[in-house]
Amino acid sequence: MERTYINEAQKAIGGTVKVQGFIENLRNSKYMAFIVLKDITGKLQITVEKEDHPDLVDTIDKLTPDSVITVTGKVMENDYVKMGGVEMIPESIEIESIADALPIVRKEIAATKKKKAVERSSIDQRIDYRWIDLRTDENQLMFKAQSCFVNAMRKFLLDRNFIEIHTPKLIAAASESGSEVFKVDYFDRNAYLAQSPQFYKQMAMAAGFERIFETGPVFRAEKSYTNKHATEFSGFDLEFSYITSFKDVMKMEEELLTAGLQAVKDSYGDQIKELFGQEVIVPTTPFPVVKLADLYKGLEEEFGYTVDESEKGDLTTEAERLSYDWVKKHYGHEFLFITDYSAEKRAFYHMRDENGVPQGYDLIWRGVEITTGAQREHRYDVLKKQAEEKGLADDVKFYLEFFQYGCPPHGGFGLGIDRLTMLLCGQSIKDAEFLFRGPNRLTP
């Protein structure tokens, strides 16, 4: 008999099916046994009256929580069963794998008259045994929602003539100004782990691909210990040609994110609200836009927050956080585009206007930066000069060549998929990454 997923088995009332999964909960008494079986689609109660099934007693007595079993039996309606009013009466139970006592506590266990409360293990302890922690409803929901979000964005772009590409992660020169890189030995020379696919996205524009996107790993050798930073994360990057302004890039991004959030809300909005207490809000467009200087002025008026003159060319961490309260109050929105940063704080390849102002933006969602986007400088002479100003011309010589033989005006942005997931579900980056990598974390 072929396996049936639990969500389909629940519909097969009166039928006999085979289900497989982990034992989430087990109650084994003298006369009855109740097993909550879980697979990636749902949960099903297995009810055993031992008097009717003496052949199953020895097998049931061997079972432990988180063991993996195969159960074949009849699906029945039972209004007293909480899981959809459905249970299975087993004909056979086969043990696939017996689990030892778990080394971590995944959820806090409340105190009873007979037992003390048991605290949940710390996030670092749970990451030590990440594969066990990932079995929880919350963790699996996060990655289902993440998959839905990414697939919706991919579909959005494919429907608009974008091509998906995959660029090298071993590169000859750092791709971002201001970001630390991981240096690796590459035979007789140095190479670096890519901080972004930026150079190669733009190469695709010079190649006439016009519209491209990529999902892939991003590496940042930054010793940051916040709840939103990681040394390796999954990026979602795109670039497209024949734009007239960085505002075209902003419009593309807000439409892309709206499509992604709509898909997540439709498929998982209720579950996210139930398990995380987070409302999935599909934003209205266009998103609010504010110049950096005007935001600082607004934050001073609203919250008394001030920064030194030397800091006003970039967004401080505290201003980033306060911007959420500010945009909610003034626009009733969760997203905020911030423009007009200092050229000193932006990458050399950002186009600048006649006043030297970079033609780009940051996008803030729920008080956290999720994107830097811009129109790129595609004119070789101007780009070379801007690279020289940053002291990078020799290091990026191969990149500058992309623009010597014709290149259309273009722009783009990059998103952190894990950070999107983190904000969507109200968790930390350690929760939102499948396997977190940070300054002190390289295993499992």
Each language-model region and where it sits:
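A translation/RNA-centric and nucleic-acid-associated enzymatic feature enriched
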Residues: 180-262, 285-444
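Flexible helix-coil linker/hinge segments at domain or subdomain boundaries
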Residues: 259-273
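Short, highly charged C-terminal tails/helix-capping segments
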Residues: 271-285
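Class II aminoacyl-tRNA synthetase-like tRNA-binding/catalytic domains
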Residues: 2-243, 435
